[in-house]
């Protein structure tokens, strides 16, 4: 049985098509303005979920990059501190060699002792170098200085400052001050006190060279470990940059709309809407019978 198509049915269909065209045009305009494929989760629930997962990975990767930058700054400071420490000890060694000259008189030996004491003060200041409000040779200790005036180390044995640079990777960014400079009676500061006292009292100091050399070697050993950790962090930085680029590409593939494609779609929707307007205008034109009713 053939169904009769009335004017009202035709009009309603035309209006629905017009509304649909207007809705599609509005969506195309929104996409062209924002260049977002996913204006709302309902656009593509699966893609939206994947985009959120990638954004979470990007946030974590960005945090690792910040940790790498902070850790690198820590290790730069530690390395510089240890280099300065080694240089000061090299000067102490030179003074020790000079002090081994048996022909030196009391005044000359006293002058050398005063230089050793000056280097000790410089060494203490260097050993207490801070970064971001923390002593770089005191581990996790919140003490204001890594070493007290008497050479006692204020750090906590085995407690290290670390930075997480990956899901399963954390790197130590400080250095063990006691391993480099000793502590208390075994510290380099006590060694320099004894050296200055020996110089003043006329006690031969050549035997102190072995102790100075040993302490210089311990500083270099700690510095070598710092260098290895710094190299690890720099390698990690390159990996994180690559990961950032890859994740951004994945995110853009899911979320970002190509400008040319967006403009083309907008033009198509505008043309379609204009056609729908023209058709609807004809459908809604009053007929002769409308005027005769």
Identify the residue ranges that each predicted region occupies.
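Cysteine-poor, low-complexity segments in flexible/peripheral regions
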Residues: 145-201
């Amino acid at each position: 049985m053939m169904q009769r198509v009335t004017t009202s049915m035709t009009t309603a269909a035309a209006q629905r098509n017009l509304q649909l065209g207007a809705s599609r045009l509005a969506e195309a305009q929104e996409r062209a303005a924002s260049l977002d494929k996913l204006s709302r989760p309902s656009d593509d629930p699966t893609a939206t979920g994947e985009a959120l997962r990638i954004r979470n990975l990007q946030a974590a990767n960005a945090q690792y990059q910040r940790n790498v930058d902070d850790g690198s700054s820590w290790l730069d400071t530690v390395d510089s501190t240890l280099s300065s420490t080694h240089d000061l000890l090299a000067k102490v060694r030179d003074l020790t060699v000079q002090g081994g000259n048996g022909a030196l008189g009391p005044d000359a030996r006293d002058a050398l002792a005063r230089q050793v004491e000056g280097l000790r003060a410089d060494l203490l200041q260097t050993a207490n170098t801070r970064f971001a409000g923390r002593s770089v040779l005191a581990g996790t200790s919140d003490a204001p200085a890594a070493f007290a005036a008497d050479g006692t180390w204020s750090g906590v044995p085995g407690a290290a400052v670390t930075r997480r640079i990956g899901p399963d990777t954390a790197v130590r960014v400080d250095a063990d001050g006691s391993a480099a400079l000793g502590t208390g009676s075994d510290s380099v500061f006590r060694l320099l006190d004894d050296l200055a006292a020996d110089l003043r009292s006329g006690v031969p100091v050549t035997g102190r060279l072995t102790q100075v050399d040993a302490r210089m070697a311990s500083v270099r050993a700690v510095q070598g470990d710092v260098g290895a950790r710094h190299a690890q962090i720099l390698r990690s930085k390159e990996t994180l940059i690559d990961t950032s680029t890859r994740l951004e590409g994945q995110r853009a593939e899911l979320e970002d709309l190509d400008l040319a494609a967006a403009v083309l779609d907008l033009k198509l929707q505008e043309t379609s809407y204009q056609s729908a307007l023209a058709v609807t205008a004809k459908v809604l034109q009053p007929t002769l019978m409308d005027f005769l009713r």
